[in-house]
Design a protein with these regions (language model features):
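Beta-loop-alpha module in the N-terminal Rossmann-like domain of NAD(P)-dependent dehydrogenases
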Residues: 21, 51-109
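Predominantly a Rossmann-like dinucleotide-binding segment in NAD(P)-dependent oxidoreductases
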Residues: 125-194, 199
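N-terminal Rossmann-like dinucleotide-binding module
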Residues: 1-50, 180
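C-terminal helix-rich "cap/oligomerization" subdomain common to oxidoreductases
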Residues: 1-3, 68-71, 282-317
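Hydrophobic residues in well-ordered beta-strands that form the structural core
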Residues: 57, 94, 119-121, 145-146, ...
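Rossmann-fold dehydrogenase core element
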Residues: 107-124, 140-146
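Active-site loop of classical SDR/Rossmann-like NAD(P)-dependent oxidoreductases
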Residues: 39, 267-279, 293
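Contiguous beta-strand/loop segments that form the cofactor/metal-binding neighborhood of enzyme cores
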Residues: 177-250, 275-288
Length: 317
């Protein structure tokens, strides 16, 4: 069998998350990290020197030199940057949420289809090792409960705290929305949502109850004002209950048996979700496969997040 071909990759945006994209790509045997681009040219030059690559002066220069690129810029720039890359025939992995609006998300999906390029979206939790076990053992979930809690981001001079350019639904909860839509695989029939701003200008804590067409109910809480971090999901099926911890990559499975309830430890091979995500993206480019989290999947999660936000602010329609 021939060796996988080397993919020429660039990273656009080398802030808190993009720096890790650059680190991981620089260590991948199947990747040539061609270069980085960031509006902060000094930052790009610093990271480029660290990883033995170059800093490009413009986005267009980077786009003309690569086959694939990661986009890790503020959400309001996702559409502009990803569009520029797609129009030059570059395969794109854009961070979540896919875009700032559903219209922008749908436009990116359309552009990628027309240009015949891969559009993957960085819902990194889909690559958490616990997800494989969850997908295998949570067929036909009946009730789902998810909690995603984080401390408020530290201040940045002259900038919003990281992530607070959007509300907590688009910042944190959207991870769980995308996973739950994937697990249930049915349309949402009803949404009931509440949320309040506490430390920022938009909702910092939110709760939503989703009712799906098949009767499954999901209750989801997200907060970025918690003193501690938590990323957990509990899934109840007809004959089992799974409690999974994304953060610690651990979990428990409880099954009904003829003697009562049997408890099992969840066998999970731990790994770095971001590295697994980038490896999957590179394989998709090599093989021209459909990504695990496509633009269409991410746009569906964004539509639901937008409806949740609308309802928090205006009430049920």
């Amino acid at each position: 069998m021939s060796e996988p071909r080397i993919i020429r990759v660039g990273v656009v945006g080398v802030g808190a998350l993009g720096q890790h994209h650059a680190r991981i790509y620089s260590q991948m045997e199947s990747v040539q990290l061609v270069g980085l681009y960031d509006a902060d040219r000094a930052r790009a030059a610093e990271l480029a020197a660290k990883h033995g690559t170059r800093a490009f002066d413009t986005l267009e220069q980077l786009a003309d030199a690569v086959e694939a690129a990661n986009v890790a810029v503020p959400t309001h720039l996702h559409h502009e940057v990803a569009s520029a890359l797609i129009q030059r025939g570059v395969h794109v992995l854009v961070e979540k949420p896919i875009a700032a609006t559903t219209q922008e998300a749908e436009d990116l999906v359309r552009q990628a289809q027309e240009k015949g390029v891969i559009l993957q979206v960085g819902h990194v939790e889909r690559f958490n090792p616990v997800l494989g076990f969850l997908e295998e053992h949570a067929a036909k979930p009946r009730f789902i409960e998810a909690h995603r809690l984080a401390p408020f981001p530290p201040p940045r001079e002259g900038l919003h705290p990281r992530g607070t350019e959007v509300n907590v639904v688009l910042d944190l909860m959207i991870h769980d929305l995308e996973i739950i839509l994937h697990l249930v695989g049915e349309p949402v029939r009803d949404v009931r949502a509440v949320g309040v701003p506490v430390l920022s200008g938009s909702e910092d804590i939110a709760n939503v109850r989703l009712l799906f067409e098949n009767g499954c109910v999901a209750n989801i809480t997200a907060s970025r004002i918690s003193p501690e971090r938590m990323r957990k999901i509990r899934v109840f099926t007809e004959d089992a209950y799974l409690s999974l911890d994304y953060q610690n990559q651990a979990g428990e499975l409880f099954r009904k048996s003829h003697t009562g309830i049997a408890r099992e430890e969840v066998p999970i091979e731990k790994g770095e979700p971001l590295a697994l995500e980038l490896q999957s993206f590179v394989r998709c480019v090599q093989r021209r496969d459909r990504p695990v989290v496509s633009g269409e999947h991410a746009a569906e999660a964004l539509r639901l997040a937008v409806e949740i936000t609308r309802q928090m602010r205006q009430g049920p329609s």
